[in-house]
From Swiss-Prot:
Protein name (record): Nitrogenase molybdenum-iron protein alpha chain
Keywords: ATP-binding, Iron, Iron-sulfur, Metal-binding, Molybdenum, Nitrogen fixation, Nucleotide-binding, Oxidoreductase
Quaternary structure note: Tetramer of two alpha and two beta chains. Forms complex with the iron protein (nitrogenase component 2).
Annotated residues for binding of [8Fe-7S] cluster: C64, C90, C156
GO terms of biological process kind: nitrogen fixation
KW Iron-sulfur (keyword) present: yes
Source organism of this protein record: Nostoc commune
Similarity annotation: Belongs to the NifD/NifK/NifE/NifN family.
Binding residue positions for [7Fe-Mo-9S-C-homocitryl] cluster: C282
CC cofactor: [8Fe-7S] cluster; [7Fe-Mo-9S-C-homocitryl] cluster
Documented EC number(s): 1.18.6.1
Domain of life: Bacteria
Enzyme class: oxidoreductase
Length: 296
């Protein structure tokens, strides 16, 4: 039996949960209520639901497919401009939230801590945002001429209205002469960040490595290999840890040709298929592209 003093604490905490839920709209509050509970001794379960898809527009600690692509895989590539394509909120909340350290001059040749968004409004939902996206990419290339490419990170509304970001990517890539990578990472696609990792890996395969293969056929890929070439994959340089790994590898006479995404560049990604070995730090987020290279 729960002592009276503990029962009072339990009731206080239940009231606190009610107070938190009162700030939500009625429909959202009903859904969030299932995820909040007070621990009571002797209960047969934890009292909360889990493994449920993130809801578009509702902040969660778990993240979504967009977070897995933009926040983890693509965002740390420092010399590319990463556009959060959709309403301003997703890009704002994912902006500079991770300590992906990098070397470079922000706004000149590196853009990792900058926030770029197409800032979707109601009219864009009605009429589509393709033209707006084309104009945005063109303007960004004028404003930041030292960028080495662009990634388009789709937010939920883009998938719902069916914008053709692939056509935009092909068109603008020809215009600016740089890689433009469309990533269908709308948040509603995955229960967590995990599917976003997979989608992002697939886009590296389809839009970056194909470019590398073509350059190799054309004889324009400038790469002189050695037997000691390696790539560090899936290290996001959180707090600078990739730099420490790189120093250790170079001390044993390995040549680190590429490291990504942390402090990584699009050119390093293009060179990666030529190395002798991939060294994976975060298996969960980068095993897909590593398996592709192993099997190719």
């Amino acid at each position: 039996m729960t002592p009276p003093e503990n029962q009072n604490i339990i009731e206080e905490r239940k009231e606190l949960i009610k107070e938190v839920l009162s700030a939500y709209p009625e429909k959202a509050a009903k859904k969030r209520e299932k995820h909040l509970s007070v621990y009571e001794e002797g209960k047969s379960d934890c009292g909360v639901k889990s493994n449920i898809k993130s809801l578009p527009g509702v902040m969660t600690a778990r993240g979504c497919a967009y977070a897995g692509s933009k926040g983890v895989v693509w965002g740390p590539i420092k010399d590319m401009i990463h556009i959060s394509h959709g309403p301003v909120g997703c890009g704002y909340w994912s902006w500079s939230g991770r300590r992906n350290y990098y070397i470079g001059t922000t706004g000149i040749d590196t853009f990792g801590t900058m926030h770029f968004t197409s800032d979707f409004q109601e009219r864009d939902i009605v009429f589509g945002g393709d033209k707006k996206l084309v104009k945005l990419i063109q303007e960004l290339d004028v404003l930041f001429p030292l960028n080495r490419g662009v990634s388009i990170q789709s937010e939920c509304p883009i998938g719902l209205i069916g914008d053709d970001i692939e056509a935009v990517a092909r068109k603008t890539s020809k215009e600016i002469g740089k890689p433009v990578v469309p990533v269908r990472c709308e948040g509603f696609r995955g229960v967590s960040q995990s599917l976003g990792h997979h989608i992002a890996n697939d886009m590296v395969r389809d839009w970056v490595f194909t470019r590398s293969d073509q350059a190799k056929k054309d004889g324009t890929l400038k790469f002189e290999g050695t037997p000691y070439d390696v790539a560090i994959i899936g290290d996001y340089n959180i707090g600078g840890d990739a730099w420490a790994s790189r120093i250790l590898l170079e001390e044993i006479a390995l040549r680190v040709v590429a490291q990504w995404s942390g402090d990584g560049t699009i050119n390093e990604m293009l060179m990666t298929p030529n190395v002798k070995m991939n060294l994976i730090h975060c298996y969960r987020s980068m095993n897909y592209i590593s398996r592709h290279m192993e099997e190719a």
